[in-house]
Amino acid sequence: MNNGSILNCVICAALFSLLAVGMAAAQQKNFTDDNFPAQGGDIKITFIGHGTLMIAYAGKVIHVDPVSMYADYATLPKADLILVTHEHGDHLDGKAIQAVTTSRTTLITNQASAKNLSGASVMQNGDTRTIDGITIDAVPAYNPDKQFHPKGNGNGYVLTLGGKRIFVAGDTENVPEIKALKDIDIAFLPMNLPFTMTPEQVADTAKAMKPKILYPYHFGETDTNELVRLMGGEKDIEVRIRDLK
């Protein structure tokens, strides 16, 4: 078996495991959320599961990596904006996207995801767009030394809304482009091996970018207590653990 076949087997096995967990999670109707005071009203972030979020602000709804295994999207609010970080099945789901899409929905993806979707607007690493007063910066998301997430393919996104900057990293490691980000109020950083970061790498990233609030997400069975321990000396960074396995 060649390296490419082995890689595909690893990814498929991981996604199958996530599907098994997610099918049960999707039956859950009540998701938790946090609210953040902002200019023009509160920002509400709802924690759907794994790498999937819903953000509401000033009457606008943003779905990030909507995936049916984590929620029944037919019951969730329609989207003004959908962001897809990359094309893996635990981040890209055409059925979920269709369920929350209307004629006024803007769908933003990376190039590889757009091949599987109609009506997608592509953002490349480094691109910036403003939609309905929300500024979106596409940030590189990749593994430097592994094939799971090649450089130049996936996006993380910095959203600027209500005077706040929210960073959703996508699947990445502690790469220089992310560590160089500044003035981040809320950061979602992935924490699971072999696809993204160890707790040590998440702590390294957070200590460099210094978000006011850090959420580990996409963390599977990784011990979140280890991250809390590693961040114990960072008095200006609040670590919040939510149900984002």
Model-derived features: positions:
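Active-site metal-binding motif and surrounding structural segment of the metallo-beta-lactamase
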Residues: 63, 68-113, 182-188
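A short acidic, amphipathic alpha-helical/loop segment
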Residues: 95-100, 177-180, 201-205, 227-230
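Core dinuclear metal-dependent hydrolase active-site scaffold
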Residues: 27-77, 120-182, 242-245
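Bacterial N-terminal signal peptides
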Residues: 10-22
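Bacterial N-terminal signal peptides that target proteins for export
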Residues: 1-13
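Metallo-beta-lactamase
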Residues: 158-209, 215-222
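Binuclear metal-ion centers of metallo-dependent hydrolases, dominated by the metallo-beta-lactamase
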Residues: 121-130, 203, 207-245
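Active-site environment of divalent metal-dependent phosphoester hydrolases
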Residues: 70-72, 88-92, 114-116, 127-129, ...
